[in-house]
Amino acid sequence: MSKLIAVPSRTKEILEKYGIRAKKGFGQNFLVDPVIVEKAAQMSHCEGAVIEIGPGIGSLTEQLARHSRHVTAYEIDPSLIPVLADTLQEYDNVEIIEEDFLQADIASKTKELKEKYGSVSVCANLPYYVTTPILFRIFEETDIPWITVMVQKEVGERFAAAPNTPEYGALSVESQYLFDVKKLFNVPGRSFNPSPNVDSVIVRFERKPDIPDIDIKAFFEMVRGCFKQRRKTVYNNLKEYLDDREAALQVLEKAGIEPKRRAQELTCDELLKIYEALK
Ligand code: SAM
């Protein structure tokens, strides 16, 4: 068995062999820390099938292949496809799809994998420039119960933030409405080649059972409206969102929310009350 991919010397060797330079435009930073990839895979509930976004040269994919029955990995960069065929040749449970994850039919793929392998999870070191759109596709278009991702530390803090903290915003409400969000551990810049200027964190989203059956896109839109200008009161933001003063006051009264409060003081449940009053 060859050396692990996620060690500095092997990664360097692979990058040199294929003349690869990490592409900033694709958010490429390759993990070179075997402990981190192992821990991420172990904690991701990937026993059945696991979907990875952006396998890069295969550092995390390798650990996922060892821990799960099947890995489906979407890679946007065509130049990495032959590299992955080489680095992951020992693993016959890995399917690499050369595609932009944001364009992929993930609902059908999830269904297919669930039928075949019993369960589907997500585990990825996400490209930073598309972290939020990727996560929201998975949140809204699949019912995947466990999503474990490495993201920039600041972004991870926003996902996991509690009300009345500077990081708390629409992103926190939207993710915590659907998931229990847990920061697992920090990953320093030196764990990557090339090292990014910022630290990262691994965040795990566990889908909540029994989420009220509402139009989540409409709810999220209203939440974004309530947070639009953070310094304004919820009344002022809602008034602009609805383009109607009276309606905004009535909705807040019906929801039992004091109009002078600001969105960052409101819990997810309180924002849901506003949405329900609106409907
Ligand atoms: N998983 C590898 C690792 O941990 O070493 C690479 C992670 S790197 C931060 C992000 C990876 O996502 C790169 O391989 C990049 O080419 C790929 N990527 C970027 N945008 C993508 C997209 N829209 N769809 C699929 N892959 C994408």
Feature annotation, model-predicted:
Residues 207, 225-279:
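C-terminal lobe and adjacent flexible extensions of AdoMet/dcAdoMet transferase-like proteins
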Residues 1-225, 253, 264, 273:
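Catalytic cores of RNA-modifying enzymes
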